[in-house]
Amino acid sequence: VLSAQVNPSGRLPMTFPLDYRDHLSSENYPFDYTSKRSDWEYDAPERKIRNLGWTEYLEGVDVGYRYFCTKATEKISFPFGFGLSYTSFEWSDAALTRKGNDFRVTLRVTNTGDRPGREVVQLYASAPESELCKPVRELKAFAKTPVLSPGSSATLELTFSAYDLASFDESLSAFVSQEGTYTLQLNRDASTIVTTLPLTLKK
C-alpha cells in the first residue's frame, strides 16, 4: 500500500475527532465510582474504582458520526467513512426508482485517474423536519465497485426500504416512517456530499 503497488479502498468505521474530549461519550468514560459491598466483603470499606471496562452512552440518537455531523462538524479530524486512494473517480447518472416500499438508487462510477482502484459510495438520508429527534443524516446503504482500470466504469446499486427511514415515536410506541420529502445524499464519507436525490413519502 505504501509503495502504491496496492491501491487502498477501505473506509473508517468511526469518526476521528480533533481531541478525545470532543466525543460526547467522553463525559462518561472513564470515571470513578464507589464499589458496592458484596456478601463476602461485608466488613470491607467502600472504595473508589476507576471504570475502564464499560461506558454508559447517553447521547440518544447522536451516537458516533451522527453527533459529529449534526452538532460538531468543526471538531472532525477524519470523518466516518473516510478513505484514501491513489486514483480518482467521477460519479454520474444517479437515479432513484421505487417499487412499493422498496427503493433502489443506481450510480455510475468512472475511474478518472491513472491507477486501478475501487470506489465506495455511501448513501445517507436526511429526514424532513419533524417533532421527532433526528440527526442531520443517517447511513442507509453503501456499495463498492470492483477494481476499475483507468477509464473504465461500473454501475452500483444501493437498496433500502421505507422502514429503513423510520424513527421511533415514543407517543405511539412504534417505529414510524415519517411522510415528507427526504434528501438522499450520495457521499464519499459522512461529511463529503457528492450529489443528492429527493425522495417523497406519503401516507
Tell what function each PLM region has.
Residues 1-118, 124, 179-187, 203:
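Secreted, periplasmic, or luminal enzymes acting at the cell surface/secretory milieu
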Residues 20-26, 142-145, 158-160, 191-198:
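Low-complexity, flexible helical/coil segments
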Residues 102-104, 153-157, 194-196:
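Intrinsic-disorder/low-complexity, polar/charged segments enriched in Ser/Thr/Lys/Arg/Asp/Glu/Gln
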Residues 116-123, 135, 168-170, 195:
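Short, hydrophobic/aromatic beta-strand segments
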Residues 124-126, 174:
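Short, solvent-exposed amphipathic alpha-helical segments in soluble enzyme
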Residues 131-172:
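Intrinsically disordered, low-complexity Pro/Gly/Ser/Thr-rich segments with frequent PxxP/GP/PP motifs
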Residues 161-203:
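Terminal connector regions
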